[in-house]
Amino acid sequence: MPEDYIKASTSNEVTALLRRHGEKARVIGGGTMLYELESRGLLSGVTTLIDISKLGLDYVKEDSSGLRIGASTTFTDALRSKQINSRPAFGALADALSAIRPVQVRNMATLGGAISSGLPGLDLPPASVAVRAKIALAGSRGRRTLDVEDFFLGFLETALKRGEFLMEVRVPRPPAHTGSAFQKLETNSVDWAVLSVATSVTLKNDKVSNARIVFGGGVVGAVPMRATEAEEAMVEAAATEDVIGRAAEEASRSTEFADDERASADYRRQVARVLVRESLSNSVERARRDKG
């Protein structure tokens, strides 16, 4: 286990510590994943933990560009925010946050930690891709922003460079009549998902003008995986149950699912049809209610 615990006061202090300690340091938010990572031997060689809870990054704000969520915002605070709950377009985030249990974890875990950990079985990564989130990173060479879809590279592997840490999650303001949703299958209420999916749909005259279908835990590659062929097949089609059903079939057919001790690839493929259908149906229903 790490030996040094440092509560940083500024972002410059964080980046300096990360540069100094390199792979021996990790930034933590709520610290809810420490035991999980240690038990799997994934903190081997890490000697220093850098706590960013005093940097003032616990907020949910909305401006003309969309949502801004600080990295230290807990799941509970995000779920309670009127900004996230104000539009059906952000439903995937609310669904994913409420699906995380137990409540003690929601009270401690942070959005920045869940995304920057690079763990594919967590619920927020696919939800964040579905709502087209971007992330703001701070480092010794300045700050940069990138699409969250490009942030995940593999199991525990992200686009973070040495000396960088995640400061903020940004969700662009979506068009009117946009809805999103999240669904997952788990073996018990505190387990990682056997399979998860997040979707978003934008309607124009009750036809699909844009769609996203994003699988989370349970796919080969250990990163959120979009079913792009199924997405494209929905565009310009009427938002009917038949179209949703065909998209669910295509998404399950074209995606490569993991085959491991938790579930076979064939089982996950069957589950995918159900989860995608349910998530898309919820997204369409929410899009019809969304006024922008």
Regions found by a protein language model. Give the residues of each.
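C-terminal structural segment of proteins
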Residues: 1-292
